[in-house]
From Swiss-Prot:
Protein name, per record: Enolase
Gene transcribed to yield this protein: eno
Record text on cofactor binding: Binds a second Mg(2+) ion via substrate during catalysis.
Organism: Moorella thermoacetica (strain ATCC 39073 / JCM 9320)
Major localization class: cytoplasm
Free-text function comment from the UniProt entry: Catalyzes the reversible conversion of 2-phosphoglycerate (2-PG) into phosphoenolpyruvate (PEP). It is essential for the degradation of carbohydrates via glycolysis.
C-alpha cells in the first residue's frame, strides 16, 4: 500500500526569485506527497551543501537542474519499490548514495526534497495530517512565533548591523491570539516608521528595513510599536535578536560597520548583557561567531540562566556540533533548519538530542522560502514550542502561520500554547 511507485523532481522558484528543488513522491496506493526546499542568505560554513549548477547563462549560476537530475536519474531508480513508511531506512539510503560528509555529491537540496516528500506521501496514504504522522498521539503543542519584523544585516540594505529584530508574543493565551498580537505589532511598527519619515518597504522575510541610526534605536522603535499596539513589552510581547555574528566576525573581532565599532569576544558578551539588562530580550541567536567556542562558553555562563541563547551557525542542525556544544556548555538552544542537515531523520535526531540535554529547539524557515508548510507540521509533531518563520507578511511566511492556525483548530481542546513555558530552561 505504501510502496513508492514514482519520484519526480522539478526546478521551481523561491521567494527571492532563485531556483529551488521541488519533489513529488507517488505511492502504489495513490498516496502522494510534494515538498519544496528552502535556501538561506547567511549560511553557516558547516551546513550541508546546496547543489547549484554554476551555469552563468541560467539564473546567474543559481540553477538547480543538476540536483533535479540527481533525483530523477539516480535517487528515484534506487528508491522506487521502497516502503515510504520506512523513513529512517530511506534517509539512510539517501545519505549512503551521496557518500560525502556534507551531502555535496547529490546535493542536500536534492536529498531533503525527497526525504520530506516521502514523509508527506506516507502521511497521505494513511489519511493522517503530517504532524500526527510524524509526532503520534502526543503531538499537541503549538509554537510561540519568533517574528522577524525589523531587518538589518544581510537581509536588508541599511546601516543596522544586527540582522533580525523579532517579537515573541509569549504572553498570549493561544496561537491564534499570538499571531494576532504579532500582526498588530507589525502594523503598529509600520505606522511608527511612517511617522518618523522612514522607509516601510519589506525585506526577504517580510520585515521592515528602515535606515535607523543604530541597533539600539531599532530596539526602541520595536518597543514603541508594541506599546502603541496596546501590549506591554516584557509581559505580553518580548524581543528576540539574531545578530548573525559570524557575518560580523573579521580577524578575531566583531565589526559593527553601521555603528563604526569593533568589539572583542569579551566585549560582545558585555554588550549583550547590557542590552538584556535594559530591554525585555528573551532570546539571542548567534550572539557570537560559529567558531568562537570559548566566547560562546563565556556568553552562556553570563546569560544562559536568563535568556535563550540559540545556536544557528554554531550548530547548523548537526548532532556532532550540538554534542560538542552540550559538552562545553555553549548556548542553551538550537535553531532547527531542515536544509542545514538535509534529511528528516537527522532533523528529528537533532531535536531529540537538544531536548534530552535541556536545550530548547526553535524550528526555522530560511530567508529564501516557498509556499511549502512542512515546518509548521514538524514544530507541532515534536512539541518544540517555538517557530521562527518571518513577519506576518509575504505569503511564503504567512503560509506557515496559516497552517498552524488550521492545526490549532483541528486539535481543538487538546491544543496547548506554551507561552513563557516554551523557555523551560530559563530561571524566571
Amino acid at each position: 500500500m505504501t510502496t513508492i511507485s514514482d519520484i519526480y523532481a522539478r526546478e521551481i522558484l523561491d521567494s527571492r526569485g532563485n531556483p529551488t528543488v521541488e519533489v513529488e513522491v507517488f505511492l502504489e496506493s495513490g498516496g502522494w506527497g510534494r515538498a519544496a526546499v528552502p535556501s538561506g542568505a547567511s549560511t553557516g560554513a558547516y551546513e550541508a551543501v546546496e547543489l547549484r549548477d554554476k551555469d552563468p547563462k541560467r539564473y546567474g549560476g543559481k540553477g538547480v537542474l543538476d540536483a533535479v537530475n540527481n533525483i530523477n536519474a539516480i535517487i528515484a531508480p534506487e528508491l522506487v519499490g521502497s516502503d515510504a513508511l520506512d523513513q529512517r531506512e530511506i534517509d539512510r539510503q539517501l545519505i549512503e548514495m551521496d557518500g560525502t560528509p556534507n551531502k555535496g555529491k547529490l546535493g542536500a537540496n536534492a536529498i531533503l526534497g525527497v526525504s520530506l516528500a516521502v514523509a508527506k506521501a506516507a502521511a497521505d496514504a494513511l489519511g493522517l495530517p503530517l504532524y500526527r504522522y510524524l509526532g503520534g498521539v502526543n503531538a499537541h503543542t503549538l509554537p510561540v512565533p519568533m517574528m522577524n519584523i525589523l531587518n538589518g544585516g544581510k537581509h536588508a540594505d541599511n546601516n543596522v548591523d544586527i540582522q533580525e529584530f523579532m517579537v515573541m508574543p509569549a504572553g498570549a493565551s493561544d496561537f491564534a491570539s499570538a499571531l494576532r498580537m504579532g500582526a498588530e505589532v507589525f502594523h503598529s511598527l509600520k505606522a511608527v516608521l511612517q511617522s518618523k519619515g522612514l522607509n516601510t518597504a519589506v525585506g526577504d522575510e517580510g520585515g521592515f528595513a528602515p535606515n535607523l541610526r543604530s541597533n539600539v534605536e531599532a530596539i526602541e522603535v520595536l518597543l514603541e510599536a508594541i506599546a502603541k499596539a496596546g501590549y506591554e513589552p516584557g509581559k505580553d510581547c518580548f524581543i528576540a535578536l539574531d545578530p548573525a555574528s559570524t557575518e560580523l566576525y573579521k580577524d578575531g573581532k566583531y565589526v559593527f560597520a553601521g555603528e563604526g565599532v569593533t568589539r572583542t569576544s569579551d566585549e560582545m558578551v558585555e554588550f549583550w548583557a547590557s542590552l538584556v539588562d535594559k530591554y525585555p530580550i528573551i532570546s539571542i541567536e548567534d550572539g557570537l561567531a560559529e567558531d568562537d567556542w570559548e566566547g560562546w562558553q563565556n556568553l552562556t555562563k553570563r546569560l544562559g540562566h536568563k535568556v535563550q541563547l540559540v545556536g544557528d551557525d554554531l550548530f547548523v542542525t548537526n548532532t556532532e556540533r550540538l554534542s560538542r556544544g552540550i559538552e562545553m556548555g555553549a548556548a542553551n538552544a538550537i535553531l532547527i533548519k531542515v536544509n542545514q542537515i538535509g534529511t528528516l531523520t537527522e532533523t528529528l535526531e537533532a531535536i531529540e538530542m537538544a531536548k534530552k540535554a535541556g536545550y530548547t529547539a526553535v524550528v526555522s524557515h530560511r530567508s529564501g522560502e516557498t509556499e511549502d508548510t512542512t515546518i509548521a507540521d514538524i514544530v507541532v509533531a515534536v512539541n518544540a514550542g517555538q517557530i521562527k518563520t518571518g513577519a506576518p507578511s509575504r505569503t511564503e511566511r504567512v503560509a506557515k502561520y496559516n497552517q498552524l492556525l488550521r492545526i490549532e483548530e483541528e486539535l481543538d481542546a487538546a491544543a496547548l500554547y506554551p507561552g513563557l513555558k516554551a523557555f523551560y530552561n530559563l530561571k524566571k
